């Protein structure tokens, strides 16, 4: 079998294997996975000894088989929409009073309700630095081929969700305003600081194909630009403001496979699992509560659904010192990730 046909066969096997793994996963979700071969890119590894070469290192001198590199570049992650919600919001379904006098007994019945986000988007642009340790031996299962990455940059957030998700219905059950409404809350932040850490490891390689894993953590805090509260039935719009920040936390772990399509292009596919959460400042609706004394709010955490998220991307190694990757992901997030870097 010639080398060109072998590369196409590996690419077909890659696509089928990742698709099967994706559809059989019950609850997977996360941020961009990145190319599984990232620790050894953009340089080309030496040819390995074969698919079944179960060799760890062929040198008695471990350091003679190692090489290192330093990478700097740009990392952009842009989420256009996501499936997220606020869960277990207690809503008053009925109120009864008993007893006489000035302090009757009030009994209320509540029901926990989940509220989904109507719209959301996240924009993150960072610079990164990576320290990579590559193994130059022909081992199929390398001891190292590992990369550590630190990122810092800006994060901007936007979301809109039902007003009832932030309502405090239980503070005064007798108030008519405690009934469920059809209002909406819209929150947008300015750019704030975000930082992230990443660890990537190649598990297996044969000189053309790679299997790797990664773990990522991202933490951001963005100052609030505006908060809008309005009701669909009544054309009333209220603006609120806060000096606090909109927090954002996300972690993920992924496994993926990549292969050389030609000497410069490596398509890849990955599956990842993780969690995302964000929370508005506790004083987000202070001014609105002053205007309406019977209108109470409670800030709750926004979390994602348990749904499948899968990533497909391509890395282009233009030279031995420069590369870029474009990745799209679908599932709980609909997003695009762009990474480019220089190796020294």
From Swiss-Prot:
Cleavable signal peptide: 1-30
Molecular function GO terms recorded: porin activity
Keyword terms, alphabetized: Cell outer membrane, Ion transport, Membrane, Porin, Signal, Transmembrane, Transmembrane beta strand, Transport
Superkingdom of origin: Bacteria
Keyword Zinc-finger among UniProt keywords: no
Entry keyword Transmembrane: yes
GO cellular component terms, A-Z: cell outer membrane; pore complex; symbiont-containing vacuole
Membrane topology: Multi-pass membrane protein
One GO BP: monoatomic ion transport
Localization annotation: Cell outer membrane
Similarity section: Belongs to the chlamydial OMP family.
Name of the protein in its database record: Outer membrane protein B
Organism whose genome encodes this protein: Chlamydia pneumoniae
Source taxonomy: Bacteria, Pseudomonadati, Chlamydiota, Chlamydiia, Chlamydiales
């Amino acid at each position: 079998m010639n080398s060109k046909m072998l590369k196409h066969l590996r690419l077909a096997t890659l696509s089928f294997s990742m698709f099967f793994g994706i559809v059989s996963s019950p609850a997977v979700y996360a941020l961009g996975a990145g190319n599984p071969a990232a620790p050894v890119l953009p340089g080309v590894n030496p040819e390995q000894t074969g698919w079944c070469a179960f060799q760890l290192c062929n040198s008695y001198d471990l350091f003679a088989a190692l090489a290192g590199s330093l990478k700097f570049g740009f990392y952009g992650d842009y989420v256009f929409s996501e499936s997220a919600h606020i869960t277990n919001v207690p809503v008053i379904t009925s109120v009864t009073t008993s007893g006489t006098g000035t302090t009757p007994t009030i009994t209320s019945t509540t029901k926990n309700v989940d509220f989904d986000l109507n719209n959301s988007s996240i924009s993150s642009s960072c610079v990164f630095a990576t320290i990579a340790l590559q193994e130059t031996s022909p081992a199929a299962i390398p001891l190292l081929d590992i990369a550590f990455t630190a990122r810092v940059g800006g994060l901007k957030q936007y979301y809109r969700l039902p007003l009832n998700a932030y309502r405090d219905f239980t503070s005064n059950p007798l108030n008519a305003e405690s009934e469920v409404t059809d209002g909406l809350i819209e929150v947008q932040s300015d750019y704030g600081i975000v930082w992230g850490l990443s660890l990537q490891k190649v598990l297996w390689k044969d000189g053309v194909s790679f299997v790797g894993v990664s773990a990522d953590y991202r933490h951001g805090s963005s100052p609030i630009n505006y908060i809008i509260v309005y009701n669909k039935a009544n054309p009333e719009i209220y603006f609120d403001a806060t000096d606090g920040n909109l927090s954002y936390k996300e972690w993920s772990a992924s496994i993926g496979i990549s292969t050389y399509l030609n000497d410069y292009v490596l398509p890849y596919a990955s599956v990842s699992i993780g969690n995302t959460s964000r929370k508005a400042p506790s004083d987000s609706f202070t001014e609105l509560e002053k205007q309406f004394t019977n209108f109470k709010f409670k800030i709750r955490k926004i979390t994602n659904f348990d749904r499948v998220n899968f990533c497909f991307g391509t890395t282009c190694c233009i030279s031995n010192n420069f590369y870029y990757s474009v990745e799209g992901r679908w599932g709980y997030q609909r997003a695009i990730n762009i990474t480019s870097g220089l190796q020294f």
